[in-house]
Amino acid sequence: PLLGTWRQVAAERRDARLARAEAQRNRWAPSELERTELRRLARVRRAGLAAVLLAVVALDVVLFGPWQGVLADGGRVVGGALLPAPGTLGDVWGSATSGWVRDGLGTSAPADPFLVPLAGLTALVGGGLQTAVNALVLVALPLAALAGWFTAGALTRSVGVRAVAALVWAASPGFLASLASGRLGATVVHLVLPWVLLAALRAVGVHARDVVDLPEVHRGLPDGGRARAATRRRGSLGAAGAAGLLLAVAVCAAPVLLPVAVVVLVPAALLARRAWRTLLVVLVPAVVVPLPYWGQVVGSWADGGWRLLVAEPGAPVVEQGAPSGLELLLGLPGGTAWFGLDDADGALGTLGRVGPAVGGALVLLLAAAALVRRRAVRGVRLAWFGA
């Protein structure tokens, strides 16, 4: 017979469970020396991020500084594919959900899915749609640098590598070309995709972290090993949900990304083994949010509805010429100079013309070198497949 009540037994088990959890925390808790070193690394990391942001913001002020007065007086950022965007949050949300396209005499058809993220952006800035578009164009460069910095941090803790990744992503020729031509959809995709990758990596438990290697033996480890060797990070369903919502934003801006995401995430789910369900969850919002649009694409496929997959928001832009194979390999959209410096004189013009090609070649060489590394070779090959 039991010598205690069921309540006493439950309390005893609870105390034992809490004691085991406390012992586990004490076993892996960093020492005072480790905490000091981690704080130093955090200061270095913050200084690196501040330097990157300072450089990018200074460049942003140089490029868009003359616009500030015009925009403050009610001006608009227009040109290329970017059209005037009048309307309030209610107008944008009504157009996104009404199922009625107002162009011409009007017709019953699903709205452009890009209106959904635009409605969220309009609500975020607290003004009209034109204010949201102006703000997005003006802060696109710092946002791209932030995206590159934090996404690189999921794979490495090196401040130098993260700084280079942030600057390369912010100075990408394709991104600058989309800004110059007013392709708002391509701009949003460039800003969102790194966060999709970061959230997807967190979803499967891949995230680099600072680990301090001290000469002393870590307490509580019978074999004298390091805590890093025995620690296994779990995936996060919340991160998978965030990746799905961010991917939905990217797909709304460029619908052609949905088949690309399927081609990338399905093999990744097969390789992930334990986290395959988590990766498949990432695809759900991208399918559900623009669902009426997919119905229109499938229903009119034989009549040319497939063109809706490659459609871009905004006015059509006529390109001067198609890029060559070498330009595509280097990530150049054809005849792209850094920040429009191709007409400048002297070293500045040379830098503007040669810089994009040199940057693309450097990224290509680093990516090729990563293929021969033994560590994380599966992830590198998967990234090449996705690219």
Where are these regions (language model features)?
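Active-site lumenal/periplasmic loops and adjacent helix-entry segments of GT-C-fold
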Residues: 65-194, 199, 208-217, 223-229
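Perimembrane helix-loop-helix junctions
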Residues: 219-226, 259-287
